[in-house]
């Protein structure tokens, strides 16, 4: 099976044979992936002119209801994702965090609409009088940026990595271009196919790159946003790229971390705190083989 890319509102085959992707447990070939032939500049423009335009005219309430509808749609299809997730080397517990945790992010962000107005913008604070008699006032409003959120994600959360980020930019009124880690992108592609087939999102709200992103970051501008999850060395290299610096593109990096859990002296064996400590440490060193970015390592 050759994975496809979703760009410009349609599914597109990359050129060439592509990178082979294997079942982590059996070594069997699952799919091949390539993004060769994609015009990243055209994808960015499509996101800005079509996806951004469609999302920014929606109110926060409409965007929130959209997220909830999408979450319910994906939740009904979760068993299909579990079966594919096993091929990534994930256990049922690993997959639960990735799949249902990711869908849960859609629900959580959908609920935030209750704190926001039924408007496409948010008024910040109170109006401030700037002249005698109130003939000149100032009032800040928050509006969506006029660009695209580019998400470069890690291999160990092919569903969560996409949904936790996209939920935020969709609620804020921005479209996304998702670049999952190629090794497990076959699971991301299946979820994106269902999202596209649901017709819940407006045109241009989501695009997918299965394969190398090559020159994508060389074409983003100051209206775009980039998020990266992965190693610190790769993240720093991307964040320091000339175009990112020149255009002052917001770059959010979630990279290597070292997390610890501390047991108080009074939490002796037999106390609820000690039992909870053991339970949490066991979970953190076994889920995803202890390789979650938030895993307890000390």
Language model segments and positions:
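Short coil/turn connectors at secondary-structure junctions
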Residues: 1, 143-149, 172-174, 202-204, ...
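Residue-level signal for inorganic ion chemistry
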Residues: 27, 63, 173, 206, ...
């Amino acid at each position: 099976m050759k994975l496809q890319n979703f760009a410009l509102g349609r599914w597109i085959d990359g050129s060439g044979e592509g990178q082979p992707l294997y079942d982590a447990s059996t070594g069997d070939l699952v799919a091949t992936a390539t993004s060769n032939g994609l015009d990243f500049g055209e994808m960015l423009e499509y996101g800005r002119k079509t996806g951004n335009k469609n999302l920014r005219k929606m109110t926060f309430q409409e965007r929130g209801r959209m997220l909830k509808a999408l979450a319910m749609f994906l939740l009904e299809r979760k068993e299909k994702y579990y079966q594919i997730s096993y091929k990534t080397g994930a256990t049922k517990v690993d997959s639960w965090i990735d799949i249902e945790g990711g869908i849960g992010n859609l629900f959580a962000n959908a609920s935030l609409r209750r704190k926001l107005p039924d408007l496409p913008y948010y008024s910040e604070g109170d109006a401030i009088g700037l002249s005698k008699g109130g003939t000149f006032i100032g009032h800040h409003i928050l509006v969506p940026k006029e660009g695209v959120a580019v998400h470069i994600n890690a291999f160990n959360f092919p569903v969560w990595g996409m949904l936790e980020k996209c939920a935020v930019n969709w609620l804020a009124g921005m479209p996304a271009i998702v670049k999952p880690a190629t090794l497990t992108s076959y699971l991301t592609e299946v979820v994106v196919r269902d999202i596209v087939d649901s017709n819940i999102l407006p045109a241009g709200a989501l695009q997918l790159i299965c394969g190398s992103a090559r020159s994508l970051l060389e074409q983003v501008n100051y209206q775009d946003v980039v998020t990266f999850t992965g190693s610190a060395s790769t993240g720093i290299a991307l964040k320091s790229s000339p175009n990112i610096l020149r255009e002052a593109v917001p770059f959010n990096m979630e990279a290597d971390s070292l997390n610890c859990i501390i047991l108080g002296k009074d939490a002796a064996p037999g106390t609820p705190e000690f039992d909870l400590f053991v339970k949490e440490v066991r979970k953190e060193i076994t889920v995803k083989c202890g390789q979650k970015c938030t895993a307890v390592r000390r």
